[in-house]
Amino acid sequence: VCYTYIVLFIIFGAFLERTGIANFFISFANRLAGWSSGGPAKVAVISSALCGMVSGSSVGNTVTTGSFTIPMMKKTGYKPEFAGAVEAAASTGGQIMPPIMGAAAFLMAEYIGIPYAQVAVKAILPALLYFTGIFISVHLEAKKLGLNGIPRDQLPRWRLLARDCYLILPLILLVWLVSSGAKTMSHSAAYSILAAIAVGLVNFFMLRLQSTQTRTFRTVGKAALGAAGDSANSVFDSLEAGAKGAITVAVACAMAG
């Protein structure tokens, strides 16, 4: 299980994170709930749930979202210890948030003898209840303290979010392949990794193209070459990050026998 399923899913998560999907999830959560009472804490909960779909790691989830949400919560008026607790609790839910869950979910599928897709489907309701409980807690705390949200004019625009929604295509592909049973788990992860590489290439190209003043054949070609180089570097970085992440899981699997 460790070498056929878990490692590939960890590598896929590393590739997907480098496409910029974490920033997209944070911006989406910011737009969705940032305006409400105690908005930054709700942003932390929603963004941690969304990023947990990709990482399956509590620590990685905290590092990704916490660097943005914790300072924002403190600035809004939450106590530092409460802000840290909210982020830690929300990020821990990444272990049980499908489709990419913690290593324990893969081991459950192996030992019980049921497909991983069934484990992921059964985890949807508990995961939603978990994050709903945290969301209600931060809402009640915000009402008790009388905290406001983020002004609407400072929130990301829906139009810009819609432009970047292509970043979630590899995740959608993975969910479809796993749920439909069209491919094996290993093949599903491999195809999703290739999709993440393609999406990352497009994202790098778009970023470089946006930084150019004029759109000529030369500038577009230069942006394409630069994006290819950025994508190649991202592939090596993703493989390195995936390998490092797999070491911890491999040790846990070895201890479990």
Whereabouts are the PLM-identified features?
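Alpha-helical transmembrane segments of multipass membrane proteins
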Residues: A49-L50, T92, A103, L107-Y111, ...
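Membrane-interfacial loop-to-helix junctions in multi-pass transporters
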Residues: V1-T4, R31-A44, T76-F82, A162-I168, ...
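Long, contiguous bundles of hydrophobic transmembrane helices that form the permeation core
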Residues: V121-A241
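Hydrophobic transmembrane alpha-helices that form the pore/transport pathway of multi-pass ion
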Residues: S27-G94, I100, A104-A105
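Helix-coil boundary and interhelical linker segments in multi-pass alpha-helical membrane proteins
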Residues: A109-L125
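Core transmembrane alpha-helical segments of multi-pass membrane transporters/permeases
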Residues: V1-N23, T212, F217-G257
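Alpha-helical membrane-interface segments at transmembrane helix boundaries
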Residues: I26, N30-G34, C51, L155-A162, ...
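Hydrophobic alpha-helical transmembrane segments in multi-pass membrane proteins
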Residues: Y5-F9, G39-P40, S48, G94-A103, ...
